[in-house]
Amino acid sequence: MYTALLQSMNRLHPRAWDFIQLVRLDRPIGIYLLLWPTLWAVWIAADGSPSLKHVLIFTCGVILMRSAGCVINDFADRNFDGHVARTRQRPLATGRIRTREAWALFAVLVALSFGLVLLTDPFTVALSFGALAVASLYPFMKRYTHLPQLVLGAAYSWGIPMAFTAATGRLPLEAWLIFAANLAWTVAYDTYYAMTDREDDLKIGVKSTAILFGAADRAIILALQGLTLGLLLVVGMRLGLGPYFHLGLLVAALCFAWEFVTTRRREPQACFRAFLHNHWAGLAILVGLILDYGI
């Protein structure tokens, strides 16, 4: 139904679907994976009572910046995507969208995002430039390092300190603990994602943690997910969070265990399902937080 609704946008413009695919609105998993930890920070920074203004700013900002990130990613990969089965039909790879059109869309998305951050405070505005820099850098890192997922982790975690500065004007230790937890989690789930393309990436020279970790990939992913839960547990202890938060962490742990078991044969589709499944872990933690503060 959601996809059909997006495809109906072609009635407004014959190329609408191409641009929807470019910004991945047809695949909202990236929005979820970026949104849940950002909202963890929004709730914790506001001691469980965030303003509607901040919830809307960060939710809309996530959607816009994730879309901008997809555009710059596809621009960077336009000469590689045609050689990978999963990506060869992307609009820039096929030429359905021209590079100058992609750059124009990227500029519009970034401008809209900046308009949102201007509704906060100078400290948060200053941090937003770092967010743009890291998000723009990530797509090019896979050419030079086996750790592009680490840069993606920083990009996907940048909204966390911004949420704290917007709500409190400062960056307490909890902000950095959540940042580190989310960075570890992002590296973990994006390694599952990279495992789906590992054979193609080896052929074309694209680097990733999936290639770097080799046969230890699943064990390292599980360790990173354990680190995520451990750091969040420390946050919970420091803030005196209660049983609902810990229940959310338990549900997340069960999600991680399921992913570990189902990827034992490293089949690409199983790895991709494990990647998708991670958003349920993030949502469980958010629901636990909201319930813990609200009850």
Swiss-Prot record:
Principal cellular location given in the protein's record: membrane
Swiss-Prot/TrEMBL catalytic activity: all-trans-octaprenyl diphosphate + 4-hydroxybenzoate = 4-hydroxy-3-(all-trans-octaprenyl)benzoate + diphosphate
TM region(s), chain numbering: 28-48, 55-75, 103-123, 147-167, 175-195, 219-239, 241-261, 275-295
Protein's GO biological process: ubiquinone biosynthetic process
Cofactor: Mg(2+)
Recorded GO CC terms: plasma membrane
UniProt name for this protein: 4-hydroxybenzoate octaprenyltransferase
Gene that this sequence comes from: ubiA
